[in-house]
Amino acid sequence: MGIRFARALTGKGPIAADIDDGRLAAAQNAGAVATYNTRDETAANRLMVETGGGVFAAVDFVGSEKSFAFANGIVRKGGKIIVVGLFGGSMSMPLPMFPLRALSIAGSFVGSLAEAAEMMRLVRGGMIDPIPLEKRPLSRAGTTLDDLRAGRVTGRVVLTPD
């Protein structure tokens, strides 16, 4: 969904990074112009070279130590990292790096009412395809949580009564 909204709002295809090739393929299908598997140790360096010095902004939809570290490694001077995901962990960064890199870090859990209205305008206007949705019986809740932790879910899973 992030890829679709970024493309609709900017008119440009964003870049996607993930640990799962299936989700990277889904990102390409949604309009990502490039994808990087973050399990590849060369991914951040390749992205830096291919973008001419890094990205201007990164949205961390996971919110883990590893995903934040990757975002921090690919954002150029003056860039911004927006953490949306709630996976958990902590970050550590020398304080002088903030002013030296002119780096901004923000958290976002919900947007404003105006942003929600804009989002719905895009959805109603047919500019955003629905998110992939899989229904599973409630009895598979444990397996579903394991799949989420392992990064095997693309889109959303809805648990329904057995």
Model region roles, listed by residue range:
Residues 75-76:
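Helix-to-beta-strand junctions that scaffold the AdoMet/dcAdoMet cofactor pocket
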Residues 50-53:
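Glycine-rich phosphate-binding loop signature in dinucleotide/nucleotide-binding domains
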Residues 19-20, 87, 111:
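Residues in the short beta-alpha loop(s) of Rossmann-like NAD(P)-binding domains
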Residues 56-59:
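N-terminal Rossmann-like NAD(P) cofactor-binding module of classical short-chain dehydrogenase/reductase
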Residues 80-82, 93-132:
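Rossmann-fold dehydrogenase core element
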Residues 21, 69-72, 113-162:
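C-terminal hydrophobic helical "lid"/dimerization subdomain
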Residues 1-41, 46:
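Mid-domain Rossmann-like dinucleotide-binding core that forms the NAD(H)/NADP(H) cofactor-binding site
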Residues 40, 62-63, 85-86:
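Short glycine-/small-residue-rich Rossmann-like dinucleotide-binding loops
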